[in-house]
Amino acid sequence: FPEIKIILAHLGHPYEHETVCVIRKHPNLYADISALYFRPFQLYHSLMLVQEYGVWHKLLFGTDYPFTTVNGTIDGLRRLNNMLEGTALPRLDSDQIEAMIHRKSLSLLGLE
């Protein structure tokens, strides 16, 4: 069903790498990042895959409310690079994180 837009919740957790590969391959597949900031290093690693594969535009902001909140999720995303201080690990692109937070998801999915 290539005309149907499909969103894979939680970036496909625990199969984030596979999910990144699948959303890269199929133009009608997207993923959200809901509830993932509870495991910050795992989220960092998953978003680094997103960055390396060039699929930031396929990610949607999500919170998994009521278990998490909008503000908690945004704060968690914005703090991800902070845990890398003192390391040589590559940083996530802060502009891409902000773009994901503010993305017009409904129009992207053809729902507006």
Residue ranges and their predicted role:
Residues F1-F61:
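Catalytic pocket-lining loop regions of alpha/beta-barrel enzymes
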Residues V55-L60, N71-E112:
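Mid-to-C-terminal alpha-helical segments outside catalytic/metal-binding sites
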Residues D64:
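Catalytic cores of Mg2+-dependent Asp-rich isoprenoid enzymes
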